Swiss-Prot record:
Family: Belongs to the formate--tetrahydrofolate ligase family.
UniProt keyword Nucleotide-binding, yes or no: yes
Annotated Pfam families: FTHFS (PF01268)
Classification lineage: Bacteria, Bacillati, Bacillota, Bacilli, Bacillales
Official protein name in the record: Formate--tetrahydrofolate ligase
Gene for this chain: fhs
Length: 560
């Protein structure tokens, strides 16, 4: 199969999609459990959990990766391809993925629905507005901002300190000009002037809450617990105190339902939720994962960026919230990323260099050690690119086998599910025969500083953590408000194991600087901001949006 001259969108547009009712039938869904959005998309009613409450749950397989290049290493492609591969070997499988954000889609990535012959479809719709979940989250989030300012304008009964409002507005785009703004200008009629700012929607606590809530009741409880500000006595002010948890639940009731779509080969996929992994917890919704586990024998899901970010949060935050144990972990490695970690310039990554691959393989080694620290069975998946040579692929496989790490090369971009069957077969054996000793990296009763230190030392390979004076002050407030039992969510660069994106490979002798600690009480974790990580990204010099267009025949171009 020669596909190197076809783009992802070309391949997607040539695919013949099946009616979404046919995909639902593969899962034995009832008609009343399906809410169709056109011909190829649907939401699944949460009432399905009542019907399947006695159903045994399938195995959840987490796909993670090494520290990526800016273009990504095809983790979503491997996730989709592996789900298709399970069906190829006769297993009932579902893929559970995050929804793409318009910010990176318009910015650098151009889309995030997999690639080649391992995509979720309809790719154009999934990458753009999809079923409107992100718009609902954005609306609910910004409605809360409006309610806060309105409360202050009409007498401020809760005595909110306008200097200590911690609830920013959001937008699902990269817009650096909105990072810091002033609202309420123009006189008394326009409210109380104050500093504000915008985060990207996928970094918002509202997104995290939607992705960690177990049902509508839990959603409302979490929304009620959101801390939006502090009063003049320094006490937290919550959504529950303002009284708006009901309307926020109403705004999010449909967004809470998972979205059913299909892969290019007709494998069912639940694409739902989408928090960033570098500035949020980076996993698809808990509801979608739990639903998938009730509907299939194997659930293939992913967590954003490398094992130092998405996987760590999946294993420390998501599994804890959902009380489930993953069956195995797939660690995606690529020749080009290992060459980058081996010191090659990004402009040279297409050139053959086996020595650079072996020099950079220590980055893979650290991510393997991280997964081992959680006690889970794992396998390395070498994701093939057209520019890879046999010698480079062989070098990775030889190193893995020499160090007793299971490894399989995959070519799911070009071959679809067929290119991942060896990986799927190996995973079924791993899950059945390999001991699963899953445990969390830290306990709830560890102090926040102990949790931060364990993540830094065990996952990043750091010597420890250093808290700025601002973070120390925030830590004292967290402990005073009895939030110290919550897990930590590290906001860190995805390009390095450290908090410095320039430190590639496997750096040593470094510490992680915690510059700020933000309690996300509704989501159920403490966000620890490190380095220079931003919660509202900016666009590159030439955004991917420049290449996007709608042609006269209605076809879309420029998504990839």
């Amino acid at each position: 199969m020669i596909t190197k001259h076809l783009s992802d969108i070309d391949i997607a547009q040539q695919a013949k999609l099946r009616p979404i009712q046919d995909i639902a039938a593969k899962l034995q869904l009832h008609d009343e459990e399906l809410e169709c959005y056109g011909f190829t998309k649907a939401k699944i009613s949460l009432t399905i959990f009542d019907r399947l409450k006695e159903q045994k749950e399938g195995h959840v397989i987490l796909v993670t990766s090494i520290n990526p290049t800016p273009a990504g290493e095809g983790k979503s492609t491997v996730t989709v391809g592996l789900g298709q591969a399970f069906e190829k070997i006769g297993k009932k499988a579902i893929i559970a993925m995050r929804e793409p954000s318009l910010g990176p889609t318009m910015g650098i990535k151009g889309g995030a629905a997999g690639g080649g012959y391992s995509q979720v479809l309809p790719m154009e719709e999934i990458n753009l507005h999809f079923t409107g979940d992100f718009h609902a989250i954005t609306s609910a989030h910004n409605a809360l901002s409006a309610f806060i300012d309105n409360h202050i304008h009409h007498g401020n009964e809760l005595d909110i300190d306008a200097r200590r409002i911690v609830w920013k507005r959001v937008l699902d785009l990269n817009d650096r000009a909105l990072r810091q703004v002033v609202v309420g200008l123009g006189g008394q009629v326009n409210g109380y002037p104050r500093e504000d700012g915008f985060d990207i929607t996928v970094a918002s606590e509202m997104m995290a809450i939607l992705c960690l809530a177990e049902d509508l009741t839990d959603l409302k409880k979490r929304l009620s617990s959101i801390v939006v500000a502090y009063n003049r006595d320094g006490e937290p002010v919550t959504v529950g105190a303002l009284g708006y948890e009901g309307v926020l639940t109403l705004l999010l009731k449909d967004a809470l339902k998972p979205n059913l779509v299909q892969t290019i080969e007709g494998t069912p996929a639940l694409v739902h939720g989408g928090p960033f992994a570098n500035i949020a917890h980076g996993c698809n919704s808990l509801i979608a994962t739990k639903m998938a586990a009730k509907l299939a024998d194997y659930v293939v899901t992913e967590a954003g960026f490398g094992a130092d970010l998405g996987a760590e949060k999946f294993l420390n935050i998501k599994t804890r919230a959902g009380d489930f144990k993953p069956g195995a972990v797939v660690i995606v490695a690529t020749v080009r990323a290992l060459k980058m970690h081996g010191g090659m310039k990004k402009t040279e990554l297409k050139e053959e260099n086996t020595q650079a691959v072996l020099k950079g393989i220590h980055n893979l080694e650290k991510h393997i050690e991280t997964v081992q620290a959680f006690g889970l069975p794992y396998i390395v998946a070498v994701n093939r690119f057209i520019t890879d040579t046999k010698e480079e692929i062989q070098a990775i496989e030889d190193w893995c086998l020499a160090h007793d790490h299971p490894v399989k090369a995959v070519n799911v971009w070009e071959e679809g599910g067929e290119g991942g069957t060896a990986l799927a077969e190996e995973l079924t054996t791993l899950i059945e025969k390999k001991k699963n000793s899953f445990s969390y990296l830290y306990e709830e009763d560890d102090s926040i500083e102990e949790k931060l230190s364990k993540v830094a030392k065990v996952v990043y390979g750091a010597d420890g953590v250093t808290l700025t004076s601002k973070a120390r002050k925030q830590l004292a407030a967290i402990e005073e408000n009895s939030w110290g039992h919550l897990p930590v969510c590290m906001a860190k660069t995805q390009y390095s194991l450290s908090d410095d994106p320039a430190l590639i490979g496997r750096p040593k002798g470094f510490t992680i600087t915690i510059r700020e600690l933000k309690p996300s009480v509704g989501a159920g974790f403490i966000v620890a901001l490190t380095g220079s990580i931003l919660t509202m990204p900016g666009l590159p010099k030439k955004p991917a949006a420049l290449e996007m267009d709608l042609l006269e025949d209605g076809s879309v171009t420029g998504l990839f």
